[in-house]
């Protein structure tokens, strides 16, 4: 019996699930992303999908990661401290495993590399690009925006999304300002070795980048 393709939500990229595989249209920077995923697999990084090659029509073929991707409004499980803690630890793990790769491939990413080249940043580390088993992060997906850069760039955006640092009335926000601040501190605690003043400054710069 043939496997029935299933369209998945993939932002601006066409994404189709076929059995245990995901087919994604290639775009600017895909060659670098495929290299990165291959290196991550070789190094035993457990949070990223395996790159399985290209389909006959030139699409990326990736391993399907079992679990639930975060979508808004976030369910209670993904608003939990466990979700924040597991996300911070996974991001730290990604940065640690790529710390010697940041200067290896600087050109050819979808987003320009940003100095200092400390790690390979995911570039869009948010609940919608993570896979969860209940409240625990078990996978990171959509590496299209990955690029070399300073780790605080990734940390700041992750905190913006996971705290989340939004106005109480924002459609994707939740919790009081005090609760958001507590969750931001929790993320920093679990990630470790991050300048919290610089985090807030970098959040502001990242948001300005998004609207510019």
Predicted regions span which residues?
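A glycine-centered beta->alpha junction motif in the catalytic cores
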Residues: 57-80, 93-101, 164, 208-212
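A generic "structured core" feature
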Residues: 9-10, 22, 54-55, 86, ...
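Conserved HxN/HPN-centered segment at the entrance to the catalytic loop
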Residues: 41-54
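Conserved kinase catalytic-core helix
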Residues: 73-107, 118-123, 127-133, 184-193
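ATP-binding glycine-rich loop module of kinase domains
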Residues: 2-38, 53-56, 61-63, 69-77
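Active-site activation/catalytic loop segments of kinase-like enzymes and analogous catalytic loops
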Residues: 155-191, 207-212
């Amino acid at each position: 019996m043939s496997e029935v393709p299933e369209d998945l939500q993939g932002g601006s990229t066409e994404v189709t699930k076929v059995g245990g595989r995901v087919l994604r249209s290639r775009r600017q920077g895909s060659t670098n992303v495929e290299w990165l995923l291959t290196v991550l697999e070789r190094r035993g990084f457990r949070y990223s999908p395996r790159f399985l090659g290209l389909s006959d029509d030139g699409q990326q073929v990736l391993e399907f990661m079992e679990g639930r991707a975060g979508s808004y409004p976030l369910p209670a499980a993904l608003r939990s401290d466990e979700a924040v803690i597991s996300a911070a630890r996974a991001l730290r793990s990604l940065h640690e495993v790529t710390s010697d790769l940041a200067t290896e491939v600087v050109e050819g990413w979808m987003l320009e590399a940003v100095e200092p080249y400390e790690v390979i940043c995911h570039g869009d580390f948010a609940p919608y690009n993570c896979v969860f088993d209940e409240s625990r992060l078990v996978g990171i997906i959509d590496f299209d925006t990955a690029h070399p850069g300073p780790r605080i760039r990734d940390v700041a955006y992750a905190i913006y999304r996971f705290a989340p640092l939004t106005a109480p009335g924002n459609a994707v926000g939740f919790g009081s300002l005090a609760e958001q601040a507590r969750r931001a501190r929790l993320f920093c605690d679990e990630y470790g070795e991050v300048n919290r003043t610089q985090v807030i400054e970098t959040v502001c710069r990242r948001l300005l980048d998004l609207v510019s």
